[in-house]
C-alpha cells in the first residue's frame, strides 16, 4: 500500500515541476522569435495556381514521365487553405513513389510542416512524419523543434512524444536544442505514466539514451542510465532482438552492464558529476524485476505473434540471454557497491529528473536558440541559391527541348 502512495506523491511532485515552466507568460520553451514565420513567409517564391500544377503533374504521371522536385515544391508553397493540404498530401505520396523520390528538397519538407501548422493540420504533419517511408518526410532539427514546440504549447504531450520517437528513429539528436526539448518531453510524459508496455520501455529507453549521450551533466548521464536500464529490462525479458530490431541500437547484449558502467564512471570521475536518485531507483527496480523467479521462468516462453521469431531467433536467445542471466547476481553486487560509493561522495541528486531537465532547459535553451536561428538563416540563403539554380536548369532544359522540337518540325517539313 505504501509503494503506490509514494508513486502517487512522486507523480504529483513532477506535475508541479512541469507547471513551473509555463507560469511566466505564454512562453513555454521556444521563444516567439524562434517560431516566428515572417522570415519564412517573406522569402522569394513563385506564384502558381494549384489546379495548373496538379494538371501538369497528373499528365506527367499518366505518361510515365518524371515529375520535377520543383513542381511538388511549388505546390506545397502555394497552399492557401486546409483543403489544399489534402491535395498536397496526395502529391507528396505520389512523388515519394516515383523515380524522382530521392530529390524531395529539404525546403519542401520544411514548408510542408509549416503549412500544416499554419492551417491547423498538425495531425496531418504528424501522420506524414510517422509514415515517412510513404511520404518522404525527413525533417531537419529546426523543423522537428517547431513541431515539438507546437504540441508542447498545446499541452499535447502524446503527439510531442511521437515526434521525439521519430527523432530517435531518424537518429537526429545532433543539435543541443533538439536534445533539450526531447528530454523535457520524455520526462514530462514519464511523469504521467504509472506503467509502460515493453514497446514503450524500448522506445523511451532508446530515446533517453540517444538524447542523453551528448550531455555531460546530471540530466544527460541520468538519461543514459535510464535508457540502458529500460533497454536492459527488455533484453532480459524479451531477448536482445526485441531491443535492436527496427531500432537504431546495438545488437550486442549487455544493456544492464552498460547501465552499471555509467554509474561506475560517475563514481570514479574527477569531475563533480551526479546521477538522479530517481534513475537509481529505476535501475534498482529493474534489477529486482529481472531477478525474480517468475520472470526468469517466463522469459523462455515465446510470445505469440512477436515479429515471427523463428528457430534462428530462438538459438540467438539461448546464446545471449543465458549468459546475461548468469551475470545478474554480479550486476546486483556492482549496483549496490556503486550506489553506496555515489552516496558517500554526495553524487546522488535528490531533485526529480523533470525538475532538473526544466532547469537545464531554462539555462541552456536561449543560447541554443541563437545558434539555431543563425544556422536557419544560413540555410534559407542556401535553399534560395539551390532553388535559383534548379529554376535556371529547368529553363535551359525547356529551351533546349523547344529548339529540338523546332528542328524536328523543320526537318519534317523539308522532307
UniProtKB/Swiss-Prot annotation:
Q: What does this protein do?
A: RNA-binding component of the mitochondrial small ribosomal subunit (mt-SSU) that plays a role in mitochondrial protein synthesis. Stimulates mitochondrial mRNA translation of subunit components of the mitochondrial electron transport chain. Binds to the mitochondrial 12S rRNA (12S mt-rRNA) and tRNA(Glu). Overexpressed in hepatocellular carcinoma tissues compared with adjacent non-tumoral liver tissues.
Query: What residue stretch is flagged as signal peptide?
Result: none
Q: Output this protein's name.
A: Small ribosomal subunit protein mS27
The stretch annotated as transit peptide is: 1-17
What keywords appear on the UniProt entry?
Coiled coil, Cytoplasm, Mitochondrion, Repeat, Ribonucleoprotein, Ribosomal protein, RNA-binding, rRNA-binding, Transit peptide, Translation regulation, tRNA-binding
Q: Where in the cell is it found?
A: Cytoplasm; Mitochondrion
What GO molecular function annotation could you give as one example from this UniProt entry? tRNA binding
- Gene3D superfamilies linked to this entry: Tetratricopeptide repeat domain
Q: Which family does it belong to?
A: Belongs to the mitochondrion-specific ribosomal protein mS27 family.
List GO BP terms, alphabetically: cell population proliferation; mitochondrial translation; regulation of translation
> GO cellular component annotations, sorted alphabetically?
mitochondrial inner membrane; mitochondrial small ribosomal subunit; mitochondrion; nucleolus
User: Coiled coil where?
Assistant: 369-415
**A Pfam family hit:** MRP-S27
Assembly and binders: Component of the mitochondrial ribosome small subunit (28S) which comprises a 12S rRNA and about 30 distinct proteins. Interacts with NOA1. Interacts with MIEF1 upstream open reading frame protein. Interacts with METTL17.
Positions of PPR repeats: 105-139, 140-175
PROSITE patterns (UniProt xref) = PPR (PS51375)
Amino acid at each position: 500500500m505504501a509503494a503506490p502512495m509514494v508513486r502517487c506523491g512522486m507523480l504529483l511532485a513532477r506535475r508541479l515541476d512541469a507547471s513551473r515552466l509555463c507560469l511566466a507568460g505564454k512562453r513555454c520553451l521556444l521563444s516567439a522569435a524562434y517560431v516566428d514565420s515572417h522570415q519564412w513567409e517573406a522569402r522569394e517564391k513563385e506564384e502558381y495556381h494549384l489546379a495548373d500544377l496538379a494538371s501538369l503533374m497528373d499528365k506527367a504521371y499518366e505518361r510515365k514521365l518524371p515529375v520535377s522536385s520543383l513542381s511538388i515544391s511549388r505546390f506545397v508553397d502555394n497552399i492557401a487553405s486546409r483543403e489544399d493540404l489534402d491535395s498536397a498530401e496526395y502529391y507528396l505520396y505520389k512523388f515519394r513513389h516515383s523515380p524522382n523520390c530521392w530529390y524531395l528538397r529539404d525546403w519542401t519538407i520544411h514548408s510542408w510542416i509549416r503549412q500544416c501548422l499554419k492551417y491547423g493540420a498538425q495531425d496531418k504533419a504528424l501522420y506524414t512524419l510517422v509514415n515517412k517511408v510513404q511520404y518522404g518526410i525527413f525533417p531537419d532539427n529546426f523543423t522537428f523543434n517547431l513541431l515539438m514546440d507546437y504540441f508542447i504549447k498545446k499541452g499535447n504531450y502524446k503527439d510531442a512524444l511521437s515526434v521525439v520517437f521519430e527523432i530517435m528513429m531518424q537518429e537526429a539528436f545532433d543539435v543541443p536544442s533538439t536534445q533539450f526539448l526531447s528530454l523535457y518531453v520524455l520526462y514530462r510524459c514519464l511523469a504521467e505514466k504509472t506503467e509502460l508496455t515493453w514497446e514503450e520501455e524500448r522506445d523511451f529507453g532508446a530515446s533517453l539514451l540517444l538524447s542523453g549521450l551528448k550531455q555531460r551533466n546530471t540530466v544527460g548521464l541520468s538519461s543514459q542510465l535510464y535508457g540502458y536500464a529500460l533497454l536492459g529490462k527488455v533484453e532480459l525479458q524479451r531477448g536482445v532482438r526485441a531491443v535492436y530490431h527496427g531500432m537504431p541500437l546495438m545488437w550486442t547484449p549487455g544493456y544492464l552492464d552498460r547501465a552499471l558502467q555509467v554509474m561506475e564512471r560517475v563514481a570514479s570521475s574527477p569531475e563533480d558529476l551526479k546521477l538522479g536518485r530517481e534513475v537509481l531507483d529505476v535501475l534498482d527496480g529493474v534489477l529486482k524485476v529481472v531477478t525474480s523467479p517468475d520472470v526468469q521462468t517466463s522469459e523462455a516462453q515465446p510470445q505469440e505473434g512477436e515479429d515471427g521469431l523463428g528457430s534462428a531467433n530462438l538459438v540467438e536467445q539461448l546464446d545471449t540471454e543465458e549468459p546475461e542471466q548468469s551475470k545478474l547476481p554480479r550486476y546486483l553486487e556492482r549496483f549496490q557497491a556503486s550506489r553506496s560509493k555515489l552516496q558517500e561522495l554526495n553524487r546522488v541528486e535528490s531533485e526529480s529528473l523533470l525538475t532538473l531537465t526544466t532547469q537545464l532547459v531554462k539555462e541552456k535553451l536561449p543560447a541554443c536558440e541563437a545558434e539555431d536561428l543563425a544556422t536557419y538563416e544560413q540555410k534559407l540563403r542556401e535553399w534560395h541559391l539551390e532553388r535559383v539554380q534548379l529554376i535556371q536548369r529547368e529553363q535551359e532544359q525547356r529551351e533546349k527541348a523547344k529548339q529540338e522540337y523546332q528542328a524536328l518540325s523543320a526537318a519534317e517539313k523539308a522532307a
